[in-house]
């Protein structure tokens, strides 16, 4: 806990998603009880510094060296800003500095396609809080921007037939997401929103 700046701190179960398994540790007693229980359950937990952000964060979809679309998420019930936890979202434009932060965060873990979550503290400093190789599709419905069109264009312009890469494959992530309504249509017929 001291390594992340003390309490309050955020705990995240490593196998959680959409805000499930994210909790705040506010007191030494609460932290000790929660972490001891999770340890006994063999649960893997990541601790992060708690950053006052007004229960808002930003999800940016990175495709190659660009941010395809970004959405601000605002929490309604607690500190979590996840849409699936009752939050709301709206399309936003990022500053050049925040675009660079998001692209570099994806590159740091060798991803050409990622959802990068950032938030700003009360002074406006940007923090990367998560990089996700399978970012989901709610952002398409909320922003009206289908980032899969950008992703396919990126793949078409950057992959040579027969070329091999040392990067981990994201094909399984893309196929799961694409398995919804667009799978049987050519990519150029997907909704462009």
Show the residue positions of the predicted features.
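A long amphipathic alpha-helix within ATP-dependent nucleotide-binding catalytic cores
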Residues: 41-44, 80-126, 149-164, 184
